[in-house]
Amino acid sequence: LIVPRVLGLGSTLHLGAVAVKLGMLNPDDVDDEILADAADHLGAAQLAAAVPIVLAAVATAGFGLRRHEAEQATGKSQTANLIVAVAMNAASAGLLVASTDRQTPAAQRVTMPSLAASLATITAGISAQYATRPKGQALVIAASALMLPVNLLFSYVPVRAALKRSQSSKKRR
């Protein structure tokens, strides 16, 4: 379940292993053909991933408008935090747009809406926290708790749909 990070130090959660442990997938379900089919049918996942990205953009705009109040509440400049929030929004949107590039490998394309939505979820939580209660942590904690289900859902649904299409086409033969 825990694997070393590709970049950087530490470990990360292997979502494929989580899906298997939860009984959502079997270890041998996913192959290159299934991933290619999932990548060809990402429209719904891409559209759904746009929702947290828009929410993150709205929360970041709210943070930008209330930055001076946050600075007064914390006694610290919030410029760097705002720049990071804007960069995270841009990265989320960039990942979502990149998921439409058919030159990108299918396995990578399938994970991009999931990663975009997860990044946007945490960005929305952090930005909303700074905009409303800069010294609090409740929204950041809630957004952090949402990241795993969002990531799992956006990764799982396209693959599961591709598996169902594959199974139904095999039955018709």
Regions found by a protein language model. Give the residues of each.
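Short amphipathic, positively biased membrane-proximal segments
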Residues: 1-173
